[in-house]
């Protein structure tokens, strides 16, 4: 806030804990460097050179400065959400030095139509985060970011409904949980959020994707339970809105008994 440039170090490669910590949805205040040390079972090894922090375990370290007035255009290019990103101005890193260890490996992954190599990261994140999510989002039972949709654009969630149990069952507390999910951390990047009531079907799981959709579609009142958030902030890579980082989101909430019977077979004329 007080300087016209700041120093940046990019770490590439190193132990798996480095790459995994970089993509982990960590709570506010817990740095990726600290989490990498927790995963590795020892502190993050680093040293200082010319005012830059260098990882002692990385395959490559790229150092440079980012100037606040040094914007240059980037794009257009394709991205993992399926859109073709337009050209925009972004900050520029002016590289000073590139360091590497002996016989370094440049790490990368293949992305595209799921499942791809990065799908394994998503699966592992779910395993680690699932027990912690109810503590971060009170009332939540579980949440699942769907890999086939690009992970964060589509969330399936199950939450408890404890408001006014003596009234006719309508989505109430689960809407509070839905707004919490869309207002915090990486779950705020979701474009579509489907949320169901745990008490309606205690055996329901977000990981049984066909079963989850059957549960929601057989209960949802489409005249009442499509909750749009318009003119809000959305993912930078989402070009479905009317501006950059601007668009809409949709919450689909289902609570109560079955109100329609779903078809289980395709008609012969289809």
Stretches with model-predicted labels:
Residues 1-3, 9-11:
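Internal mixed beta-strand/loop scaffold within catalytic domains of large alpha/beta enzymes
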Residues 6, 14-270:
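Charged, compositionally biased interaction regions
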């Amino acid at each position: 806030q007080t300087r016209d440039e700041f120093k940046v170090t990019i770490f590439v490669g190193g132990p798996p804990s480095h790459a995994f910590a970089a993509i982990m949805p960590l709570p506010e205040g817990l740095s990726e460097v600290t989490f990498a040390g927790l995963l590795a079972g020892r502190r993050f090894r680093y040293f200082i050179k010319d005012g830059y922090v260098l990882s002692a375990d990385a395959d490559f370290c790229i150092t440079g400065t980012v100037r606040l007035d040094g914007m240059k255009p980037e794009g257009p290019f394709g991205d993992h959400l399926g859109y073709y990103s337009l050209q925009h101005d972004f900050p520029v890193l002016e590289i000073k030095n590139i360091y590497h260890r002996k016989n370094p490996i440049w790490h990368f992954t293949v992305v595209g139509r799921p499942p791809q190599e990065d799908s394994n990261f998503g699966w592992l994140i779910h395993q680690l985060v699932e027990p912690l999510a109810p503590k971060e989002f009170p009332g939540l039972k579980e949440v699942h970011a769907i890999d086939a949709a690009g992970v964060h654009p589509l969330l399936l969630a199950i939450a408890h409904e404890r408001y006014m149990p003596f009234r006719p069952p309508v989505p109430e507390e689960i809407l509070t949980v839905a707004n919490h999910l869309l207002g915090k951390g990486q779950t705020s990047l979701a474009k579509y959020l489907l949320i169901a009531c745990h008490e309606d079907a205690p055996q329901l799981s977000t990981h049984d994707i066909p079963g989850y959709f059957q549960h929601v579609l057989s209960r949802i009142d489409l005249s009442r339970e499509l909750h749009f958030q318009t003119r809000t902030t959305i993912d930078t890579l989402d070009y479905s809105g009317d501006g950059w980082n601007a668009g809409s989101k949709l919450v689909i909430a289902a609570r109560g008994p079955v109100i329609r019977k779903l078809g289980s077979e395709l008609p012969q004329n289809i």
